[in-house]
Regions:
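N-terminal strand-loop-strand
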Residues: 1-36
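Buried hydrophobic packing segments
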Residues: 10, 149-156
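Unchanged
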Residues: 40-141, 145, 154-164
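Short, well-ordered strand-loop elements centered on a beta-strand within folded domains, enriched
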Residues: 15-22, 97-99, 146-147
Length: 164
């Protein structure tokens, strides 16, 4: 059974960028990986949207009242047992992330047009728990975004392509 989780895909409307984080190297799960702010849906959350907003505020200081939720993408099942719902939101105005040291090593912004252009994605493979797995990757500068986060970005790119 998959555990419910959610991430906030924050589009900085004024700068046309997407907020990403580099997870702390001290974390048990996915240390040092690039990810959206997010985490498990807690009993007190208002579903996936509430969890994504709460986690973004905890991890990078993005106030819940400073974003406009646009909707969600289809949930993604991860090899680590989570059903992750990407929550898409606009943030208006300036925002200076304040990474929570225990969870986030760094917060940064990637150009929206880079992570929503299918031409920037590639499919790679690596062995995980004895099984060869294929996954999306979308590198940008010094950042290597892969796996579930890249798959969610690719899902957003594909959704936008259908809107054209």
């Amino acid at each position: 059974m998959f555990r419910p989780a959610a991430v906030l895909v924050t589009i900085m409307a004024d700068e046309a960028t997407v907020l990403l984080t580099k997870r702390s190297s001290a974390l048990k799960h996915h240390p040092g990986q690039v990810a959206f702010p997010g985490g498990k849906v807690d009993p007190g959350d208002r579903g996936a949207v509430g969890a994504a907003l709460r986690e973004a505020e905890e991890e990078v200081g993005l106030r819940q009242d400073s974003v406009e939720v646009l909707g969600t993408l289809s949930p993604h099942l991860t090899v680590t047992g989570f059903e992750v719902t990407p929550v898409i939101a606009f943030a208006h105005g300036a925002f200076a992330p304040r990474p929570e040291a225990g969870e986030v090593e760094e917060a940064f912004f990637v150009p929206f047009d880079h992570v929503t252009d299918p031409a920037h994605f590639r499919i790679e493979a690596r062995r995980w728990r004895g099984v060869m797995r294929r996954y999306y990757a979308v590198p940008w500068g010094p950042y290597y975004t892969w796996g579930a986060t890249a798959r969610m970005l690719r899902g957003l790119a594909d959704r936008l392509a259908r809107c054209d």
